[in-house]
Amino acid sequence: MLWFKNLMVYRLSRDITLRAEEMEKQLASMTFTPCGSQDMAKMGWVPPMGSHSDALTHTANGQIIICARKEEKILPSPVIKQALEAKIQKLEADQGRKLKKTEKDSLKDEVLHSLLPRAFSRFSQTMMWIDTVNGLIMVDCASAKKAEDTLALLRKSLGSLPVVPLALENPIELTLTEWVRSGTVAQGFQLLDEAELKAMLEDGGVIRAKKQDLVSDEIAVHIEAGKVVTKLALDWQQRIQFVMCDDGSIKRLKFCDELRDQNEDIDREDFAQRFDADFILMTGELAALIQSLVEGLGGEAQR
């Protein structure tokens, strides 16, 4: 089981029913296929259990997990530039004239297509967890762009997907700033020793504190000067550590050893059973964490 490292959280904005059985058929129309010789990138669905199952969905307790795979061709800019310059020089020498800008632009496409079949590929996988009980979708990635790309693939597969980023009633950075300023956090949470503070003004500077007591005069001075906490390392119930960001994303999830070892009694050779048990355990813990976080940060914005 791939334990999630990050969470981008989305709210289903309309009541829609997502069932694994139906999704299995819908995702099958967009399974991953490798790049052809002229493709820059390809994205599609693969089984979340990898080679251990052909199923494109895995479900338990109203929770569904799916996995997107992306292949991107790597063509470094200097390589393209060098090949383009060589082509331009040859044509200009052959024709005895300088090429126009439009001619150079069309040559760039030609060069790109000639290089693509020889380009290296970079592969990445993104797990997505659908919580049908609470109407949430969580994407295991650190960037909004990657999350949106994966959601777009799901939307295309299903026909429609009404989702919006989970919005809170109060600005997250103001709540995080108050937690650091006062040293008092929401119940179940503890401050760790890492934070990022930014000035409200665009060019006012950034402070990154690591391995430092956050409830200190040094940090207080920055807050008094008008900086707000935009990232804050927290511990929840001594079970999960993470960094809360002002955009609502949850990064660098770290599950305690006791939690990760909870299913050690299951034979590792029985991959399917272990995957299922870990999935139930992880989603149960993360659903509780998200609920606690939303409450601690002042509640979800009214829809």
Curated annotation (Swiss-Prot):
UniProt keywords, alphabetically: Cytoplasm, DNA recombination
Name used for this protein in its record: Recombination-associated protein RdgC
One Pfam family cited in the UniProt record for this chain: RdgC
Family label: Belongs to the RdgC family.
Protein species of origin: Salmonella typhimurium (strain LT2 / SGSC1412 / ATCC 700720)
Function of the molecule: May be involved in recombination.
PANTHER family named among the record's database cross-references: RECOMBINATION-ASSOCIATED PROTEIN RDGC (PTHR38103:SF1)
Keyword NAD: no
A molecular function GO annotation: double-stranded DNA binding
InterPro entries linked to this entry: RdgC
Compartments (UniProt record): Cytoplasm, Nucleoid
Primary subcellular site in the record, as a coarse category: cytoplasm
HAMAP family registered for this protein in UniProt: RdgC
